[in-house]
Amino acid sequence: MWWFQQGLSFLPSALVIWTAAAFIFSYITAITLHHVDPVLPYISDTGTVAPEKCLFGAMLNIAAVLCVATIYVRYKQVHALNPEENRIIRLNKAGLVLGLLSCLGLSLVANFQKTTFFAVHVCGAVLTFGMGSLYMFVQTILSYQMQPKIHGKQVFWIRLLLVIWCGVSAFSMLTCSSLLYNGSFGADIVQKLHWNPEDKGYVLHMITTAAEWSMSLSFFGFFLTYIRDFQKISLRVEATLHGLTLYDTAPCPVNNERTWLLSRDV
């Protein structure tokens, strides 16, 4: 049996591979058509102009669904391993909410481009990266709470390093983007897709985009740490019938006679 066939380990694997493919395909399309600069564009800029925005939106919507599934499975796994630990239960529920909000933000970023609906796009980015960072932080705390009884210390340390990586990237992106978009460099900078080294704010722009890509990579790394955990869990859907028919009320008896849809004489 292959490693991705064990339990539900294919979920985080598929999430990372699919999302990375969405970024790569839209990036290649955007630079081939000269819609963005090849050196560190914003991730969402590679999905701003047609046709790549269609690919970007469709693939990230699927990525959001995979992310919801991954976050839910993680929630169920932690709950099953710690059914009576109140502190862990509260943190686990908080992590579920934060993760789902991050998935919602990912879908908003994918479908509302900054050149069309800037406010909605920024709201989606805040949900994706902000709630996503908090989700990683909560899951790292849970990993600390569950070691060494549930898993080894290595998992906690790896996730802690990834959270620190994410935090440094988030701080850099937030600081530089705040300076870049405070109005000092012009109002049209929001719609700007092409940058030259001579442009005002170029350095801040490059730091912001580099931090955004770095933050995304930290997300990928964090979800990859779920692979080993998910090899040890499976979920199943069980159908429970609340009656033997689909009538709202009991049907009237017809003396074992059946009404034909078409007359036999036809």
Curated annotation (Swiss-Prot):
Any one of the GO CC terms: photoreceptor inner segment
One GO BP annotation of this record: regulation of autophagy
InterPro entries xref list: DRAM/TMEM150_Autophagy_Mod (IPR050911), Frag1/DRAM/Sfk1 (IPR019402)
Keyword set, alphabetical order: Apoptosis, Autophagy, Cell membrane, Lysosome, Membrane, Transmembrane, Transmembrane helix
Transmembrane regions: 8-28, 53-73, 92-112, 117-137, 160-180, 207-227
Bilayer topology annotation: Multi-pass membrane protein
Source organism, top-level taxon: Eukaryota
Family matches, as Pfam families: Frag1
Subcellular location, record wording: Lysosome membrane; Photoreceptor inner segment; Apical cell membrane
Family according to the record: Belongs to the DRAM/TMEM150 family.
Biological role: Plays a role in the initiation of autophagy. In the retina, might be involved in the process of photoreceptor cells renewal and recycling to preserve visual function. Induces apoptotic cell death when coexpressed with DRAM1.
Protein name from the UniProt record: DNA damage-regulated autophagy modulator protein 2
Record organism: Bos taurus (Bovine)
